[in-house]
Amino acid sequence: MRIFSDRHSRGKAAACAALPGERPCDCKPPCTQQTDNTFLTRFFRNKRGNLAIIFALSLMPLSAAAGAAIDLNRAFIVQQRLERALDAAGLAVGSAPAASDAEMKAMAQSFFDANYNDEEMGVPGELVLAAANGRVTLSATAELPTTIMKIIGYDKLTVGSEIEVVRESKALEVAMVLDNTGSMAWNGKIGALRTAAEDLVSILFGDQDTPDLLTMSLVPFVTAVNIKTPGFDMNWMDVDGNSEFHGENFDPNRGPTNHFELFDGINNASWKGCVEMRPEPYDTLDTAPTLGNADTLFVPYFWPDEPDNGSGYNNNYANDRIGGNKNKRQSNGGKYMNRNVSVDETPSSTEGPNKACARPLVPLTNSKSTLINEVRAMEPWYNSGTNIAEGLAWGWRVLSPGAPFSEGASFGNPDVQKALILLTDGNNEIVSQSTHNDSDYTSFGYVGTGRLGTTNRGTARNIIDQKVAEMCTRVKADGVRIYTITFQLNSSSLAEIFRNCATEPELYFDSPSNEELRRVFQSIAFDLSNLRIAR
């Protein structure tokens, strides 16, 4: 779609608008028109509106001109609101290339009304829509009763605006990679995120339930991501336990070390679907899982039962059944065999081998209802920490044309625009433990095992930061447009990482409040719609 208007350059459109009940953001200055067929009116109708108004005012006595400027300024404001509302309507129509004329008119009117408040100055007339040869023209006028200009015979001004939309069949694929860690439970943040993400889905889908040219994915993350969702394939998994770090927390002399076998031994729990990070270099690559290379396969997340009668541990859910030091008791795989354990998988505080494992991701889908239902179901999950790198990795993978999840079009396809939205409310974080583990269990195991090349939590955080930066570069190299959002976060270092991660500096957003987050998501939604503008 391409939008033209009297004040926009070709191909440009407003990047923000609002849903019903929200106050939209400001747009650019307008021009005005006046209804009476007079010399002054001809200048009002001049598309170079500001010059016309200045010249017209010069013809009046100074006092009358000063008074008329008040009415003309009010007309400017009305023009802004008309143009903003038409932009929103135009973006909605342009993103629905399969809609009929009647459907377009209803859709455009709905978005126009939502963006032109009844309480605002000016009474808008009917929205006029004309469609031909793939082009849609939208126009509207509003009448504004005058105040000072009544004295010189002008009772009202009619302000008009018009845009042209070229509808195009360019597809859009969007991955929302959203922080669902425990800190999102504070200050109403998870509720604000649900609302903002639902706004984005609603704006992009408009009135269409299953559009042909739009698919979206949702990737909630903690330190791990849950991939057990429709389309999941066990061929992606390290079933035989051969990956480099599979079973590193268990003693092979005291029972199974394969995480699938450990789950099989528990009578009242099964693998929920979270996976560990792959070993380097595959942790930051989109390499497809291959049965002949175990390190490309994914290891099921299994938080070990931590020792009985020990302080500082966050997940003690089974009887140790043996004596010895804490490491010996924790690494005993035999205690899971044919046993019932204490399990609680209800967020936010959980217990058991799936502790801190969020809801499954949603692969690319064109189902509006599926996305909205899963957005509304997001919850914060305590413990483990925050691993932005793992969330980003899975956002990249769901957009990829290859396994795991192959719904995405090929990278570089000129008929498809791919985008990724990455949000966090915290730094890459590892929950500490004053224990032999040095941390909570995470998607890269315990810090104390040294899987990241260090047993120091601070150094481990820096390494994860580096992995985020590496992946941002690779994702952008695949032609994916990245938007980044920090939410109620006071961290200059992460802000810099996210600013550099975004495709352009202006696509990084800092949202210090719940209200601002909603405005950010709406702005992103309209920018995403603009990606489908013919240029």
Predicted regions and their residues:
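Extended low-complexity, polyampholyte segments enriched in Ser/Thr/Pro and acidic residues
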Residues: 101-166
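Von Willebrand factor A/integrin I-like adhesion domains
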Residues: 112-118, 471-535
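Alpha-helical assembly-interface signal, strongest on the long, hydrophobic N-terminal helix that forms
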Residues: 2-10, 25-105, 182-185, 482, ...
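Divalent-cation-coordinating short motifs within acidic/hydroxyl- or histidine-rich contexts, strongest
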Residues: 2-3, 98-102, 172, 182-402, ...
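Solvent-exposed loop/turn segments at secondary-structure junctions
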Residues: 142-145, 169, 180-185, 222-226, ...
